[in-house]
Amino acid sequence: MEDFPVLEMVCLGSSVALSGLFYYIYRKKRKTVDKLKEAPVMALDAKLIDLLNATPGKCLQYVVVEGTVQPVGEPLRSQFQESSVGVIQKLVLREHKLVWNSLGRIWTDSERVLLQRVNAVPFNLLGLNKSFVRVLCPLEATGPKMEIVHEKFHQATYGFTDLIGQYLSGEKPKGQLETEEMLKVGASLTVVGELILDTDRLLKIRPPTDGSEYFLSSADFETLLMEQEGQAEVWRVFACICALAGVAVLIWTGRRYYRQLKLRWEQENLRREFEGMGTGEREEDNGVENACVICLSNPRGCVLLDCGHVCCCFRCYQALPQPFCPICRQHIKRVVPLYQA
């Protein structure tokens, strides 16, 4: 029986590792979804302060608050559009280029971030009757998806010598993409986190102290919940696919192992049968005309099928490098003992 192949070990180990990783991510996402489903949606009004005053510790661990963005002081202004103001600003400069793939013999697209800067100012969520809640640590949250207020692509220019250098280096610059994103003043925002009543009598929402995920979303709560459920389902599908691939590799390997083991059993039984009948025949058949054509010492003791030639002893048959008849070179499908009267 052959050793366990390295390729099958790698495939099986990779499928087990990936399925375990994807299942861990799925369980983490599933836990987040379950916490979101349990989180109460709090109306942002004057009654919220009374509720927190009556709550032990003046804290609600995981709640949903919806409102409109309002800066505490001076808002951020767009560097490219004077009319655009917001509370979070993200400037990104990306380089786009073509890279020569020597394996596929093609040019492939590649990009990398040359510069990224995020600015933020304190802001509140404005609710009913001028009630508001201060949003703390917005850059630590997942989201929000901000509006792109500026996007411009700067095309690369180069001369003849640059072209030669590009083909020698295997990199061909395409240009740079400049983008600016902003969370604008007045935008609707959904925040999921820990709500507290601070010592200054201000409502504040912050990242949960129990490690739960902190969300800022431009969509409503129902859309946010559906997005998280969709992400959890994707990871579950990935985990199932990898697990099924591992099971398939295991079944295929086990089947091949069983076939090899069965063949070994058959060969062992056949060897014992030949040994049992060969002791008496060696004394009777010592003629040259009945000698094995390979070793020329043992008598011919097996019939090679399907060709039917009787030309060798069983030991020499087992020693054949490939199962081909020594006489006609036909493939040997099976071998049976030769019984002589």
From Swiss-Prot:
Pfam families on file:
GIDE (PF12483), zf-C3HC4_3 (PF13920)
EC number of the protein: 2.3.2.27
Reaction(s) this enzyme catalyzes, per UniProt = S-ubiquitinyl-[E2 ubiquitin-conjugating enzyme]-L-cysteine + [acceptor protein]-L-lysine = [E2 ubiquitin-conjugating enzyme]-L-cysteine + N(6)-ubiquitinyl-[acceptor protein]-L-lysine
Q: Quick one: where is this thing mainly located?
A: mitochondrion
Sequence intervals crossing the membrane = 6-26, 234-254
Q: CDD domains from the entry?
A: mRING-HC-C3HC5_MAPL
Q: Which residues lie on this side of the membrane: Cytoplasmic?
A: 1-5, 255-341
Q: What molecular function terms (GO) are annotated for this protein?
A: identical protein binding; ubiquitin protein ligase activity; ubiquitin-protein transferase activity; zinc ion binding
Q: What is known of its domains?
A: The zinc finger domain is required for E3 ligase activity.
Q: How does it sit in the membrane?
A: Multi-pass membrane protein
What's the protein here called? Mitochondrial ubiquitin ligase activator of nfkb 1-A
* An individual GO BP term: positive regulation of canonical NF-kappaB signal transduction
